[in-house]
Amino acid sequence: MLLSGSSSQSLAAALAAATGERLGDVTYDSFPDGEQLVTVPPAVDGERAVIVASTPTSDAHIEVLQLQDAARDAGASEIITVLPYMGYARQDDAFDPGQPVSARAVARAISTGTDRVLTVNPHEDGVLECFDVPAAGVDAAPQLAAPLPADLTDPVFLSPDHGATDLATSVRDAYGTGVTDHFQKVRHSGSDVTVEPSEIQTAGRDVVVTDDIVATGTTMSEAITALDDPARVFVATVHPLLAGSARLKLARAGVEAVYGTDTIECAVSEVSAAPAIADAL
């Protein structure tokens, strides 16, 4: 049985359709002081419970822990926790003295209530090692090729840095044509950083900028404005957080369209990560 977090209801429904698993009747309540309460159906007794819940907020993390506890208490035979988007995963190190490794802290908490974890395109694969139970990544990047225009002109698929070229390659391979490259960050001083493409020529070509997460859109917008006269620019991201004025920044930088998956359910969630998750289950 699939048990959805409140932030992943559409994705859970798509996953139910893809797998044929029942979609549990979960209810979400809150108290006047802000505390949350979830309720799972008693029919989960003796069944495998697959919890599907992105955690873009701290409240969402609490909800996952409650879903796990409720499912276990209701008699679930096995619990698999699917984190389409894992919050705090970018804090995978103590970057300054006295700071926690937040990814490890939340992974340990989630591990206590589950038998296995799946998460979609984690920011760093090393995050998977933070869990105390078997954990695996799911690649939903190929899904992002589907909404791209079929008539891209000599397309270039760009990643934000060399370390993320695999994601750009996944989208390019799924699209079927084009080349991949990556932006380069050049640090001139402690606060002066410029972002520019490698040697690839973009003039007159369609450019697809790919990334696992687009949060504020600031760095990506700066990178896009550094491109040399591209024909069209599109952004494809697995996790479209698009915080604050991110969408406006990208539009002002010349981005024609933004395509994301439903790991974060929003207006640009053009494709679902459900097929990739279904394969992993």
Swiss-Prot record:
Isomerase listed as a keyword: no
Entry's Gene Ontology molecular function annotations: ATP binding; kinase activity; magnesium ion binding; ribose phosphate diphosphokinase activity
Source domain of life: Archaea
Cofactor(s) in the UniProt record: Mg(2+)
Keyword presence, Nucleotide-binding: yes
SMART domains noted in UniProt: Pribosyltran_N
Binding site for Mg(2+) 1: H123
Free-text function comment from the UniProt entry: Involved in the biosynthesis of the central metabolite phospho-alpha-D-ribosyl-1-pyrophosphate (PRPP) via the transfer of pyrophosphoryl group from ATP to 1-hydroxyl of ribose-5-phosphate (Rib-5-P).
Annotated protein name in UniProt: Ribose-phosphate pyrophosphokinase
Gene name of the record: prs
